[in-house]
Regions:
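N-terminal structural segment of carbohydrate-active enzymes
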Residues: 25-202, 280, 287, 617, ...
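Aromatic- and acidic-residue-enriched segments that line the glycan-binding/catalytic groove
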Residues: 31, 35, 51-73, 142-162, ...
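C-terminal beta-strand-rich structural cap/linker in extracellular carbohydrate-active enzymes
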Residues: 38-39, 603-641
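Short, solvent-exposed turn/loop segments enriched in Gly/Ser/Thr/Pro and often Arg
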Residues: 44-46, 134-146, 208-217, 308-313, ...
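Active-site-proximal helices and loops of the catalytic beta/alpha 8
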Residues: 194-202, 211-212, 220-227, 285, ...
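Active-site-adjacent "subsite" loops/lids of carbohydrate-active enzymes
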Residues: 224-288, 292-293, 310
Length: 643
């Protein structure tokens, strides 16, 4: 090992200790497996309908009184923007639909019947893709399609299991006391899913919504019915009570971001913790799913939690909760959701990591997707925001680009010229990225250029430090604007989808084929295989080289004790020559492992370094020591090559 390399590693370690004012707190140990994770995010209602017998019913909807009686399960393979008859009847609850609006209410009352059996049926698909960790959006009992409005956190949604009617009867009399809780058919099927996932080497993360509930949550139902006499009166933030002596009185309460469908759990008087009632309930739910005991026997539990709206709960609560989690499972992974600078939040609250919007997704959008910030700024943003975290946290950060809360990656790219940037250079993300807020938003299928940029993003994501996240369907070629269009039914090889030929704005549009794209899948699979085959991509250090703002090029060195890899990027729309040279680079017999383009470019010696001739909009991965056969170049995204 070169002395200069040792010095560089030492500098990184010292920087991690010295960052910020005063000594940095010791970071919670992220489990080793999290550094090697390739995450796959599943939005359960839209992933796969494996058991049509458990499909949701009209009465199971969020507000069935406002939904026409001829409501029915939506056709999985239909044109997403084509409205069913019952949707056209629904406008502003009870008024007839005189001006059809796709985004009024109907689309949010659609149900497609995605369930746990559908996930079980597709575990082999996930394994073949190469991912090794699943992140589930909420799967607990709730009325909405997104299920962030929990009716119960101790039970899987009955309509995701094999016996909805039986489960609903079984759990009807339960309260916050775990002694009253049963293991429903849906619960047991989820435990089976966990065991089957583990058998395939897949870890399981579930969405924990500990900030708010739905109005059907047992405690809130009792509160609404019994008012100040309710045993749960201290569980929520009530702002006014009903007064039998005053007909004008109203029952009001704090809802998450003002939404009355999402009543917020109360905090302690000093605002430093969750109120005792909901706090204990969260503790009990946490234990139930991390360390389940079924019929007197221990069962395999989940491997961790993704925490919704985590930065809206007090640090004291999360610190204690994270410590409790690790008493149940020292290898559990806890990931807080935040869109803000997150290093202090992660460390102070004791999380393993966070959803890495600020330190990864934002810079990636600014440079690779939108092409609006220079290469040097891209590198400096990634460096400064990454290095704000403790070194032990960085490899476990969830490096996502899109999610259920954004437009899809492919559509971000299609609409890259619509992106807005603040005067201070801040990168827009999750703003006006849909038809409702931006009538010029393009809902069409990505063209060849957009797919080329998608390949760049994916290959960089798979080679950068931190655990990459694939949002369901991206690997199959799916596109879509912000919610609800980012939650279309998953396209599968065995299903034939109708063309997307309807425009929600009533405009004429071309007919786009949304069916499973084998070339897109092949590229994702190759990029994931590259990451899984080279541990340096998961745990090696990062150093950016040769940023050229004029040419739109940049290189990144990933290095460890046994292997060096260089990722060369050409974001420009013209071919470029990139020279790779650095004192830390200790290459012998270098080779090109993978390209986001159609062919592997030649690597040639140039003085003390190496030269690559990169086509436009291309990322290439090289390494120095030949110890295994290179990953084969995948077909370009969007090609017609068979999978």
């Amino acid at each position: 090992m070169l002395y200069s390399r040792t010095l560089f590693f030492s500098t990184i370690a010292l920087a991690g200790v010295a960052f910020g004012a005063g000594p940095a707190p010791a970071a919670p140990a992220s489990p080793e497996w999290a550094a090697h994770a390739v995450w796959y995010q599943i939005f359960p209602e839209r992933f796969r309908n494996g058991d049509p017998s458990n499909d949701p019913t009209h009465d199971s909807l969020e507000e069935p009184a406002y939904v026409p009686k001829d409501w029915r399960i939506s056709n999985w393979t239909a044109d997403w923007y084509a409205r069913d008859a019952w949707e056209k009847e629904q406008d502003g609850h009870e008024a007839p639909d005189v001006t059809p609006d796709f985004y009024k209410h109907g689309v949010f009352d659609r149900r497609y019947g995605g369930d746990l059996q559908g996930v079980l049926d597709k575990l082999d698909y996930l394994q073949s893709l190469g991912v090794n960790a699943i992140y589930f959006n909420p799967i607990f009992y709730a009325r909405s399609l997104h299920k962030y409005d929990g009716s119960s956190l101790q039970h899987i949604d009955p309509y995701m299991g094999p016996d909805p009617k039986g489960d609903l009867a079984l759990i009807a009399g339960e309260n916050e006391d775990p002694a009253t809780w049963h293991w429903s058919a849906a619960d047991r099927l989820f435990l089976k899913l966990i065991a089957e996932a583990h058998r395939r080497g897949l870890h399981v993360l579930v969405d924990g919504v500990f900030n708010h509930t739905g109005r059907d949550f047992f405690a809130f139902r009792d509160l609404k019915e019994n008012q100040q006499a309710s045993r749960y009166k201290d569980w929520y933030v009530v702002t006014s009570w009903l007064n039998p002596a005053d007909p004008s009185s109203k029952f009001t309460y704090k809802g998450w971001w003002g939404h009355d469908t999402l009543p917020v759990f109360a905090a302690t008087a000093d605002k430093n913790d969750l109120a005792p009632g909901p706090r204990q309930y969260v503790w009990d739910v946490t234990k139930r799913w991390l360390a389940p005991v079924v019929d007197g026997q221990p069962a395999q539990g989940i491997d961790g939690w993704r925490l919704d709206a985590a930065d809206e709960r007090p640090a004291k609560f999360w610190t204690a909760w994270n410590a409790y989690v690790r008493t149940l499972n020292p290898n559990a992974y806890t990931c807080g959701e935040t869109w803000k600078p997150a290093a202090q939040f992660v460390e102070a609250d004791g999380f393993s990591a966070c959803m890495n919007y600020f330190a990864f997704a934002f810079p990636v959008k600014g440079f690779l997707i939108d092409g609006r910030i220079p290469a040097s700024r891209f590198a400096s943003l990634l460096d400064s925001r990454r290095e704000a975290f403790q070194p032990g946290v960085i490899p476990a950060l969830q490096n996502l680009v899109d999610s259920h809360d954004t437009d899809r990656l492919a559509s971000m790219i299609v609409n890259r010229k619509l992106a807005t940037y603040a005067p201070d250079g801040d990168i827009s993300y999750d703003e006006k990225n849909d038809v409702r807020n931006n009538t010029t938003y393009d809902i069409g299928k990505p063209d060849a250029t957009a797919r080329a940029i998608q390949r760049m993003v994916v290959l960089f994501q798979m080679t950068y430090e931190g655990a990459p996240v694939v949002y369901y369907g991206d690997e199959a070629g799916m596109w879509g604007a912000h919610d609800p269009d980012d939650r279309m039914p998953m396209v599968w090889q065995d299903l034939k989808f109708a063309p997307q030929s309807t425009d929600p704005r009533g405009k004429a549009r071309r007919a786009d084929d949304p069916n499973f794209d084998p070339a897109v899948f092949a590229f994702y699979k190759s990029a994931i295989a590259l990451r899984n085959s080279h541990p340096v991509l998961a745990t090696g250090a990062v150093r950016f080289l040769n940023a050229n703002d004029k040419e739109g090029t940049l290189s990144m060195l990933r290095f460890g004790a046994d292997e060096d890899m260089v990722v060369a990027i050409n974001r420009s729309t013209k071919p470029r020559v990139i020279r790779i040279s650095d004192p830390l680079l200790n290459w012998t017999k270098p080779e090109v492992l993978m390209s986001s383009g159609a062919k592997l470019p030649a690597l040639s010696k140039s003085g003390s370094g190496w030269e690559l001739r990169l086509p436009a909009l291309t990322v290439v991965v090289c390494r120095g020591a030949v110890s295994a056969s290179p990953v084969a170049a995948a077909q370009p995204l969007g090609s017609t090559a068979a999978h």
